[in-house]
């Protein structure tokens, strides 16, 4: 099964490809040789693999213990094999059994607060992390995880239909996400590795690639960074508003 960013279908050139080999029972030894050969093949063709091997029961136990694992399973999908195995896992980790809505919401809010706290310094502002900084991709994903867990939302447009987002706000969210995706893709390509920080050494190259030209008023690099700051400010404000609305909705729920 595909998990994480691979499960969401959000890969960039040097993203890890996160997979799990899902077994019906805890009988890894029976398949150990086949599993090793399969993983060796993936490494031999130079894929950056993040992998785990778990049974249905182990998934339920690990997800109940660790919200990161629970989150990765929420957005998982079957790649090959018996799809009923993943369907069983999803039943085992549904919100009535582990990480009930309020618990999940509070845990994800706490994660976000701690993440923001690490990226509020001047250095992080000048060379921001596209994923982890406030208003970054992780904040967008957090909204997706919470809305999927509580409302069963399949995408952000569901939030428009549920009147959490205005159509214009939805467009702002998608525009901001696409901008961050574009910059992250460019970072991977020019650094020739997985890179999520918008380092000084890459900013000029990216500005040139994306057509931000110097003029009498400002440099191309300044134009790039101004757009970055505008987009993440908008995304952070949307994130704050949505979390507040979710908080009110979840507090009203009977679960």
Label the predicted regions.
Residues 1-255:
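A nucleotide- and high-energy phosphate-metabolite-utilizing enzyme signature
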């Amino acid at each position: 099964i595909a998990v994480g960013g691979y499960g969401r279908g959000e890969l960039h050139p040097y993203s890890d490809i996160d997979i799990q080999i899902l077994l019906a029972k805890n009988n890894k030894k029976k398949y150990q040789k086949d599993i090793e050969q399969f993983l060796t093949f993936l490494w031999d063709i130079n894929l950056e693999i993040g992998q785990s091997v778990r049974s249905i029961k182990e998934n339920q136990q690990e997800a109940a213990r660790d919200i990161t694992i629970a989150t990765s399973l929420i957005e998982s999908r079957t790649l090959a094999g018996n799809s009923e195995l993943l369907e069983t896992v999803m039943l085992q980790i549904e919100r009535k059994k582990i990480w009930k809505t309020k618990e999940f919401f509070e845990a994800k809010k706490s994660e976000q607060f701690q993440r923001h706290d690490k990226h509020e310094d001047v250095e992080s502002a000048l060379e921001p992390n596209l994923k982890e900084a406030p208003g970054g991709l992780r904040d967008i994903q957090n909204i997706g995880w919470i809305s999927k867990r509580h409302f069963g939302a399949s995408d952000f447009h569901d939030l428009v239909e549920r009147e959490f987002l205005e159509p214009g706000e939805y467009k702002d969210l998608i525009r901001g996400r696409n901008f961050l995706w574009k910059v992250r893709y460019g970072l991977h390509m020019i650094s020739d590795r997985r890179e999520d920080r918008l380092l000084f050494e890459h900013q000029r190259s990216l500005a040139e690639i994306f057509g931000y030209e110097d003029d009498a008023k400002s440099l191309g690099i300044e134009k790039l960074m101004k757009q970055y700051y505008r987009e993440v400010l908008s995304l952070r404000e949307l994130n704050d508003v949505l979390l507040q609305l979710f908080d009110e909705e979840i507090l009203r729920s009977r679960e």
